[in-house]
Regions:
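Short alpha-helical segment that forms part of, or immediately flanks, the ligand-binding pocket
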Residues: 13-16, 20, 40-49, 59-63
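Conserved donor-binding/catalytic loop of nucleotide-activated donor transferases
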Residues: 20-23, 44-52, 68, 74
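Short acidic/histidine- and often glycine-rich active-site loop of Leloir-type glycosyltransferases
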Residues: 37, 58-68, 73
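Nucleotide-activated donor-binding/catalytic signature segment of Leloir-type glycosyltransferases, i.e.
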Residues: 1-17
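A short, well-ordered alpha-helix in the C-terminal region of glycosyltransferases
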Residues: 81, 88, 95-110
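Acidic donor-binding loop of glycosyltransferase active sites
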Residues: 19-36, 51
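C-terminal alpha-helical cap of glycosyltransferases
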Residues: 114-136
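Conserved acidic donor-binding segment of nucleotide-sugar-dependent glycosyltransferases
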Residues: 67-68, 72-79, 88-94
Length: 136
């Protein structure tokens, strides 16, 4: 393949720039029970970057990609399904791939952006404190 790049290891500071050069970003996890309950940090990173995601994983990570409309998710370790999904993304118009990336970015901003997470956490703490005050 001449249009696939695996850039290797780089300092974290340069990663956003490298990731933004990609048309599609790949995240994979092995098919293990423990991995079904986890969301790889790459999923959140890729959403923040605003690029379509091609995910080969099961469970929460796959559900998140699908729920966000941020790309395509295939079962972990299913090479045929991964190849089909890659072709499907390749055949999309650039505008459609951009839409998938934008969906992921919006989902990230709504669900994972730090200041919003802090605000939600503080809201939960306030509810907890208020509910215990009313019990006294």
């Amino acid at each position: 393949l001449t249009n696939v790049s695996v850039p290797g290891s780089y300092p974290i500071a340069v990663m956003p720039g490298l990731l933004r050069q990609a048309a599609v970003l790949l995240v994979t996890l092995a098919d293990r029970p423990a991995f079904r309950a986890t969301v790889p940090s790459k999923v959140q990173t890729y959403m923040a970057i605003g690029r379509p995601i091609l995910a080969s994983l099961n469970g929460e990570g796959a559900r998140l990609v699908q729920e966000a409309g941020a790309g395509l998710a295939t079962p972990a370790e299913d090479a045929a399904a991964l190849a089909q999904a890659l072709l499907q993304l390749y055949r999309l118009a650039p505008e459609e791939r951009a839409r998938l990336g934008a969906n992921g970015r919006r989902y990230f901003e709504t669900h994972f952006e730090r200041s919003r997470l802090v605000d939600r956490l503080l809201g939960h703490f306030r509810l907890f404190v208020d509910s215990h005050r009313s019990e006294q």
